[in-house]
Amino acid sequence: MDTNNLSLAASTWGFFFNREPETWLTIPQAIGELTSLGFGVEVWTNRGWDEAWLNRELVQEIVEACAGVSHISVHTRPEHWQWDPHGLSDEVEFCSMIGASALILHPNSLGLDGPSPRPDFPGIKRLAAQARARGVQLVLENTRDTMWALDLALDEIGDDPQKTNLGICIDVGHAYISQDAGREPIRNYLERYKGQLVHLHLHDNFGDADEHLPLGDGSIDWQDLADTLKAIDYRGPAVLELQRQGDLLAAFIDARDYLRSLGL
């Protein structure tokens, strides 16, 4: 793989998580901060956990902020971290409005959770068909210890994203804290789903908690990650999902420089 083949984006989430509400930017302002540095964006449509769905005026402001952005994805809202076909349908429509190519879903968004999951696979297929018609791909993200959920979805829906409109996002930080993928969980997650891999989430931790640290502040072996991505020839979007109480933009810039130094 040649250098600079990751399409780097950054998440708006870091501007709001664990920060005092009086310091929050608007969502369009957060998008503007990221795009001014040349990043694509992953849009979260909520700032606090309980923030209401977007009004028409705010949607239009987000549309304008996203105009001309290299890569746009949307992360599902917390209230849709359970199976809610109507709510997810609204998120698909929002993706289409702002030009987002992907809607990122946790397994529980598709009913893939609990001790005896019974997902509505026909409903998921209908949602995927709706998304395809809007130019949006559904992308299933691993959370902690969810290899079983990704496998089940691919077994039931199909493992060819071109046919199913369901791809996989490997969240490197989530893989690192997982106990279901052996001693090299990041490498094993990436290699297992390389045929469905259409998206990455990048952040660091120490292998025990989902801290979303800047790259290099935890214990993830980023050189090994780079080698694995080159080996599987991944050439797609990678979203920096970072939190920092200080200068968040500096963390994004440092992460980009570090990844480029690794040939990504």
Feature names for model-found ranges:
Residues 59-75, 124-134, 222-225:
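Alpha-helix-loop-beta-strand connector modules within alpha/beta enzyme cores
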Residues 69-70, 95, 155-159, 223-228, ...:
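Short, electropositive alpha-helical surface patch
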Residues 20-27, 52-63, 83-92, 114-125, ...:
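Distinct, well-ordered alpha-helical segments
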Residues 98-115:
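Active-site groove signature of glycoside hydrolases
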Residues 41, 71, 128-219:
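Acidic/histidine-rich catalytic cores of soluble enzymes
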Residues 11-18, 44-48, 75-79, 108-110, ...:
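Active-site beta-loop-alpha junctions enriched in small/polar residues
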Residues 6-13, 39-43, 70-76, 103-105, ...:
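Hydrophobic faces of well-ordered beta-strands that scaffold small-molecule active sites
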Residues 1-96, 101, 264:
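N-terminal pre-domain/capping segments
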